[in-house]
């Protein structure tokens, strides 16, 4: 077995929570939804709960995930708590974590992007308004609806917020809430990681014990209740696609997203990422991959707002539509660079079966090289080809530190199995 961290050629970033800076953190997660990796990332997050001031864990869309799935992981944490607290008195008690686990939105609010307050959105507002002068870091692992609702209900909290959004597929499912934030709160301090997060499980050193399956088998299996629970997800293979948001706060310079760290290195966002069509499109129509596509199509003669409409992209993804009696409006965020087909289903015969497609393509260099003046604090995956892992922009800025963050994770996981001794504390 390779000695963990041996041979690491890059020095670990020396800032962040592991260097002693305590960050206020809320996690918004679609745990229990469509991707089991949120369970893995929650295990990872709780193992570092002693170095954060954890203020909330919110269940968010998309999918069937609920607060009870957060509690499921906290139950495992409770079984390991006796050992964990011997390493640090600052691990929160299981009941303290249960008290701040909140239910957020259950589904998208529709094209407006906002709807009614939820327990989760109200909790974000409450935490942001507290007297603590430190910023509040909101790590969004799933849908961004609760953050959008919080900003809508209390726009004055914006200066306090620092957001790390695991975008990509989550942005696709939450496009209306994303559109609301981007249009109405452009000065929000946010990192939009559409592909950078993939560096946690794609590329980097995957030889020997560093492989996604071999690492889990060697360093997570049999390490307490949390380790065993981790192994029940994704057949015991590391994905942890939301963990870069945690790594960003653990090691790096969270005040400056352009600097390297465990959660990646980012670039200022550019303009022109949203495309609006007033017609059905063809393959010759191009939009930006991971951008926003909006259709505002005049209703055909004879159609009224009482007629029903459903738009399905890629034969599987339904878009929420509005029909105001004059215009049919719907949005989509293409999560990959490819041709995206869509079809309209309606009880209005002239519209039913109408279809189209468009090509999502990477943005040109002349666009990405001009930072947006409208969004001065909005950051995104580094478009530099040298930072890409295959087709994933920015992913190398994470995976080049794979041995560091996985090695540290393995050391943390050992805490679950064995109580601390004076010797083990010194080694860590």
Where are the regions a protein language model picked out?
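Bacterial N-terminal signal peptides
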Residues: 1-6
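N-terminal acidic, glycine/proline-rich low-complexity segments
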Residues: 12-428
């Amino acid at each position: 077995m390779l000695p963990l961290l041996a041979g690491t050629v890059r020095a670990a970033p020396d800032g962040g929570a592991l260097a002693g800076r305590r960050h206020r953190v809320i996690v918004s997660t679609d745990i229990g939804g469509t991707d089991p990796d949120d369970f893995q990332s929650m295990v990872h997050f709780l193992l570092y709960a002693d170095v954060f001031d954890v203020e909330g864990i919110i269940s968010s869309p998309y999918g069937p995930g609920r607060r009870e799935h957060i509690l499921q992981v906290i139950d495992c944490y409770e079984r390991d708590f006796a050992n964990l607290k011997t390493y640090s008195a600052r691990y929160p008690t299981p009941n303290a974590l249960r008290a701040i686990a909140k239910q957020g939105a259950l589904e998208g609010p529709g094209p407006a992007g906002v709807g009614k307050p939820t327990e989760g959105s109200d909790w974000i507002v409450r935490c942001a308004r507290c007297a603590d002068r430190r910023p509040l870091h909101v790590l969004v692992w799933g849908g961004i609806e609760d953050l959008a609702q919080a900003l809508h209900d209390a726009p004055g909290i914006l200066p306090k917020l620092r957001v790390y959004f695991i975008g990509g597929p989550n942005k696709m499912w939450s496009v209306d809430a994303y559109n609301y934030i981007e249009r109405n709160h452009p000065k929000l301090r946010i990192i939009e990681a559409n592909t950078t997060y993939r560096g946690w499980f794609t590329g980097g050193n995957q030889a020997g014990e560093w492989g996604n399956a071999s690492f889990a088998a060697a360093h997570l299996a049999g390490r307490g209740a949390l380790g065993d629970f981790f192994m029940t997800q994704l057949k015991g293979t590391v994905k942890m696609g939301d963990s870069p948001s945690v790594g960003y706060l653990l090691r790096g310079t969270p005040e400056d997203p352009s600097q390297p760290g465990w959660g990646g290195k980012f670039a200022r966002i550019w303009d022109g990422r949203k495309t609006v069509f007033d017609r059905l499109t063809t393959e010759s129509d191009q939009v930006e991959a991971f951008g926003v596509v909006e259709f505002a199509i005049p209703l055909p003669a004879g159609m009224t707002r009482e007629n029903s409409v459903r738009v399905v992209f890629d034969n599987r993804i339904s878009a929420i539509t509005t029909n105001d009696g004059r215009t049919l409006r719907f949005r989509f965020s293409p999560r990959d660079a490819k041709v995206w087909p869509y079809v309209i289903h309606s009880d209005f015969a002239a519209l039913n079966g109408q279809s189209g497609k468009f090509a999502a393509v990477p943005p040109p260099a002349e666009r990405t090289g001009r930072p947006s003046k409208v969004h001065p604090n909005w950051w995104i995956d580094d478009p530099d080809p040298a930072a890409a892992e295959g087709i994933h922009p920015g992913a190398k800025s994470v995976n080049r530190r794979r041995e560091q963050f996985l090695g540290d994770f393995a050391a943390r996981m050992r805490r679950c199995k064995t109580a601390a001794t004076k010797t083990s504390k010194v080694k860590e």
